[in-house]
């Protein structure tokens, strides 16, 4: 995630020449104070104050410059005074970077004894932002609105969350997804229009022959394998059979070789997300389990069975959640525990669940896999952390993409499962199992999802709004009749 260090958000403060030089100097000084403070809070992305926007020409120039500056990932607009919105028409019609309308003011409280008309003329966000907001709404332009004093914790958190979404948007627009093999045969939801995805999101999806990956695996040197195996030993609880001298030690070495070769291929090609499928493994000794788990933990996106849409979404949520403590993973609804009024979903996959969500030190073991026709693969075994969580997916409906996010509560495992050989999570659906499941299915939600313990639906809605794709949020207030109506309305709204 080194690319995050070079990103910046531009802070554009609106006013007008009507107020005179002295007032505008004070506006600029106040903007500098706010910028310094916010940057001192160690934001996810640095904020860069730009010259005051006081004329249509200034505003047009700023917006065009933001478009052309590669490292600028978004614009914060604040109307310190009244800034007539017709001045913003030229700039806003051209601005193609994410926009945040910052509805704040310098002083938290009214200076009751000192307030006069000079103060009133200078501190006009309350109506200046309404004028600006009208014009943005007139353009039907998506934006985020943050309301509150710039020193409040809630405002800082909202800005941080917005910046995290910006980083994911930027990354999607530069993302390359590598596919090894095609989709799992006869599966529908993992298919999709890769050309339309590149037009809509910006990422490219291309396929590569297994022989190319095999060549990369075969060129890995023994010294690097030895070093990686030592890293395994330091990071995980190794089963006895995988320890030095164990009967399955060679399989662990083979897995390390696959990991190094896979990573080398991805890095050489600039790929930050990838897919594979158990039906296309020619030349590879085992289905990559441990290698995929570890690469996801390093921030790569992944989708099993050729699921490139989920691979790209895993990467997006990895970027959004960089530095946060709880993790996210490729996931699949696998099976249920159907106690009355206490239904629980067991989420997992054949192998590929990211250890960033693990609640303890994972066990590294090799177990049989009765699918794929290859040698038994290495994998990390663990249970997920508990807490508020989301499951998200993007599906291709033929004429548009739809993102679906479901609120959930990840829970501790009810009982030990000594024979379950995969990483896994348990969760309860909102508003309950019945409605939550129906809502996902009615919305066309995939059987693959991105499970996150850090990123919530509001952030994902902002992500979807920027890309102008449909967003369905399943939550504690979801009612099926209302959802069915929303799905009907969206058929018209997103044509």
UniProtKB/Swiss-Prot annotation:
The gene designation is araA
- EC assignment: the record states 5.3.1.4
Q: What pathway does this protein act in?
A: Carbohydrate degradation; L-arabinose degradation via L-ribulose; D-xylulose 5-phosphate from L-arabinose (bacterial route): step 1/3
Residues binding Mn(2+): 305, 332, 349, 448
> HAMAP family, per this entry?
Arabinose_Isome
Role this protein plays: Catalyzes the conversion of L-arabinose to L-ribulose.
What's the protein here called? L-arabinose isomerase
The GO terms this record gives for MF are:
L-arabinose isomerase activity; manganese ion binding
Phylogenetic placement of the source organism: Bacteria, Pseudomonadati, Pseudomonadota, Gammaproteobacteria, Pasteurellales
């Amino acid at each position: 995630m080194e690319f995050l260090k070079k990103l910046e958000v531009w802070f554009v403060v609106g006013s007008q020449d009507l107020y005179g030089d002295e007032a505008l100097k004070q506006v600029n000084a106040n903007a500098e104070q706010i910028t310094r403070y916010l940057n001192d809070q160690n934001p996810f992305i640095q904020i860069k104050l730009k010259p005051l926007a006081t004329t249509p020409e200034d505003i047009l120039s700023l917006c065009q410059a933001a478009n052309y500056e590669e490292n600028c990932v978004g614009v914060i607009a604040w109307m310190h005074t009244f800034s007539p919105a017709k001045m913003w028409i030229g700039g806003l019609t051209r601005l193609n970077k994410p926009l945040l309308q910052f509805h704040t003011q310098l002083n938290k409280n009214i200076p009751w004894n000192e307030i006069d008309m000079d103060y009133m003329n200078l501190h006009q966000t309350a109506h200046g932002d309404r004028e600006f907001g009208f014009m943005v709404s007139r353009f039907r332009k998506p934006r985020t609105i943050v309301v509150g004093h710039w020193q409040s914790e809630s405002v800082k958190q909202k800005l941080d969350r917005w910046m995290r979404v910006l980083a994911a948007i930027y990354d999607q627009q530069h993302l390359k997804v590598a596919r090894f093999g095609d989709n799992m045969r006869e599966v529908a939801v993992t298919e999709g229009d890769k050309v339309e995805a590149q037009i809509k999101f910006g990422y490219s999806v291309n396929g590569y022959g297994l022989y190319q990956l095999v060549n990369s695996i075969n060129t890995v040197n023994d010294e690097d394998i030895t070093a990686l195996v030592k890293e395994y030993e330091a990071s995980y609880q190794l089963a006895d059979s995988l320890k030095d001298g164990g009967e399955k030690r060679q399989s662990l070495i083979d897995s390390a070789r696959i990991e190094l070769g896979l990573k080398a291929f991805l890095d050489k090609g600039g790929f930050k997300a990838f897919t594979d499928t158990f039906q296309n493994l020619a030349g590879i000794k085992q289905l990559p389990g441990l290698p995929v788990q570890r690469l996801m933990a390093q921030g790569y996106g992944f989708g099993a069975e050729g699921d490139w849409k989920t691979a790209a979404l895993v990467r997006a949520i990895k970027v959004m959640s960089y530095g946060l403590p709880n993790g996210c993973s490729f996931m699949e609804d696998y099976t249920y525990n159907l106690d009355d009024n206490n239904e629980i979903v067991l989420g997992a996959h054949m192998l590929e669940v990211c250890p960033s969500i693990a609640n303890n030190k994972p066990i590294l073991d090799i177990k049989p896999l009765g699918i794929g026709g290859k040698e038994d693969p290495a994998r990390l075994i663990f249970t997920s952390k508990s807490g508020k969580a989301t499951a998200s997916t993007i599906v291709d409906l033929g004429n548009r993409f739809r993102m679906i996010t479901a609120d959930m509560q990840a829970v501790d495992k009810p009982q030990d499962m000594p024979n379950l050989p995969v990483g896994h999570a348990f969760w309860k659906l909102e508003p309950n199992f019945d409605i939550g499941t129906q809502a996902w299915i009615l919305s066309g939600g995939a059987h693959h999802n991105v499970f996150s313990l850090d990123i919530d639906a509001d952030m994902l809605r902002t992500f979807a709004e920027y890309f102008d794709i449909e967003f369905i949020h399943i939550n504690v207030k979801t009612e099926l009749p209302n959802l069915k109506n929303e799905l009907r309305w969206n058929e018209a709204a997103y044509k």
